[in-house]
Amino acid sequence: MNKTKLLLILVIVILTMGCIIPAAATPTPDLFATLQASTPSNISEPQVTQPIASPVFNLSTAAPTSITTSAQTPIPSPSSSDQPTGHIVFTCQIFKTQAAEQICIMNADGSGFRRLTTEDNNRHFYPSLSPDGQRVLYSSYLVDNNYEIYQMDIQSGGVARLTNSYGVDDAPEFSPDGQSMTFMHNSPTRNTNQIVISDQGGANAENIPRITGWDPTWSPDGKQILFASDRDGAVQLFTVRRDGSQIHRITNLPAIRGRSDWSADGQFIVTYSGEPWHRELYLMSADGSNVHQLTPSGGNSQGPSFSPDGKWVAFTAYFDKYNDENGCEIYIIRIDGTDLRRLTNNDYCDYQPRWGP
């Protein structure tokens, strides 16, 4: 082959490589970060069919990964009679093309799907059920350009605004006796996240002293609060008594985000950890020992919540639509890492589940 032909081939190869456009990286959603206010566009509401057809899908599971080797709190063996009961509230997008998230509820087996909030152009997040299952707390961007805490009576649909503050109030949760609530308050003047405790109607609100953090969760006896914080540098989980005393760091996991839960018997805590698109659920003893990966790898699992009987965990994951921004669905799994089931099946995101009676 002469030099002219070689030169011609080299020119063609260079031109061809220059035409290849690198694939754009898929944006990584962060569904549990501190909320930023925005006003979604107007759009008509589609009809919602009730209940969801074929709600339960059994998926293959992997054995939970042991993180520690110390003596463990025994995990109850599953029984065929231990089927999920109660209700799960969660954030549902309803409209795939806009950001007007709503609050929805369904039975613990995925049936009986129902939308609770009705303001199409307002965003609603972080629902949680009352101990009697009759009310739901949530954060909403309804008036005054602020996220405030609201309470809805599920039976009547009546809504009451519980907070009226300057800043962001989110992640509310009822105390175990239903008489108080805790939530996170972010003050734009201080730019800090504070944990607040108030009466269940929003009165007598007080910050827990010396605490900065988010995503608070009550202990079953109502004496402690579990929360996420970067007070020691990297984000970890801490417990504190409601008067601000006895602060204990209980985790040493990489890239913890927040939303965690405490089992009703007080023995276990479940959280999630990991880099974007590689997050997993972890089960541990209440003091932070005996950490085990609960979910199979590859689902980008987030936002866990125990069932009232402590035998199941509800969470958000992308097992069926990995790397799809609209691919998050609600799943449940037994606390021994078996019997993974998908409860929702939509073309929009369902996330932030909270289990109740």
Predicted segments with their positions:
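N-terminal secretory signal peptides that target proteins for export/translocation
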Residues: 1-2
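Sec-dependent N-terminal signal peptides of Gram-positive bacterial secreted proteins and lipoproteins
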Residues: 5-23
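Sequence signature of WD/YWTD-type beta-propeller architectures
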Residues: 18-357
